[in-house]
Amino acid sequence: MLAKRIIPCLDVKDGQVVKGVQFRNHEIIGDIVPLAQRYAQEGADELVFYDITASSDGRVVDKSWVSRVAEVIDIPFCVAGGIKSPEDASQILSFGADKISINSPALADPTLISRLADRFGVQCIVVGIDTWFEAETGKYHVNQYTGDESRTRVTEWETLDWVKEVQKRGAGEIVLNMMNQDGVRNGYDLEQLRLVREVCKVPLIASGGAGTMEHFLEAFRDVDVDGALAASVFHKQIINIGDLKRFLSEQGVEIRLC
């Protein structure tokens, strides 16, 4: 059995790490490189960096900090932000990233997924899915351009259909960003995760809602996700990654201990 992964998420805006609630009202957390170093030292299995306004601004992620991060950490990391072509991806990978993640650009042009997978291999192509539960309809829908609340829009894609589509096109991993739970710290949306797990045959990463160690345990034990991504509990030092991994190991979760 592959070890489960603990993945801190660093949302980047204007060169600094920020964090919002339900993808809004972002506050500055700190500088990118020191935070990356801290999480690597605490025992993170990998890191994810989202340049949250790159797609909505029509630009590619700022590559200068990508190379600085690669110089100071020795764990895998994934970068997302405005990647619209194999050339964009090639540059980011050449600066030291191990994986690239696409989200809004894939919704704008789904062929991008297969073009990237064909060139670089599915192992380094992650698709992020920003999913929102509409209480009125009882449905989960995919959102686009979520880094800029003035441009965020609901797409025609229902979440489960998009999960199936991106796998068909070559996604090697899916990060499910559950927007209703983002930054609230009241637990992952286990019901949605179960629905997605049934149709997701590639590694599935849960994102949005972690507030306690038990929340991570529930995602691994009850849904069998492959990794759990979180931000605010790590940024605000509510949970220490080393302590979390020891807790999970004691509960029988296969995890890499520091």
Swiss-Prot record:
GO biological process: L-histidine biosynthetic process
Protein name: Imidazole glycerol phosphate synthase subunit HisF
Entry coiled-coil feature ranges: none
This enzyme's EC code(s): 4.3.2.10
Top EC class, one word: lyase
GO cellular component: cytoplasm
Pathway where this protein functions: Amino-acid biosynthesis; L-histidine biosynthesis; L-histidine from 5-phospho-alpha-D-ribose 1-diphosphate: step 5/9
InterPro entries recorded: Aldolase_TIM, His_biosynth, HisF, IGPS_HisA/HisF, RibuloseP-bd_barrel
Catalysis performed (reactions): 5-[(5-phospho-1-deoxy-D-ribulos-1-ylimino)methylamino]-1-(5-phospho-beta-D-ribosyl)imidazole-4-carboxamide + L-glutamine = D-erythro-1-(imidazol-4-yl)glycerol 3-phosphate + 5-amino-1-(5-phospho-beta-D-ribosyl)imidazole-4-carboxamide + L-glutamate + H(+)
Alphabetical list of Pfam families matching this protein: His_biosynth
GO molecular function, one term: lyase activity
Leader peptide range in chain numbering: none
Residues annotated as the enzyme's active site: 11, 130
Organism: Serratia proteamaculans (strain 568)
Broad class of the protein's primary localization: cytoplasm
UniProt entry tagged with the keyword Ribonucleoprotein: no
Gene3D superfamilies, A to Z: Aldolase class I (3.20.20.70)
Family: Belongs to the HisA/HisF family.
Biological role stated in the UniProt entry: IGPS catalyzes the conversion of PRFAR and glutamine to IGP, AICAR and glutamate. The HisF subunit catalyzes the cyclization activity that produces IGP and AICAR from PRFAR using the ammonia provided by the HisH subunit.
Assigned keywords, A-Z: Amino-acid biosynthesis, Cytoplasm, Histidine biosynthesis, Lyase
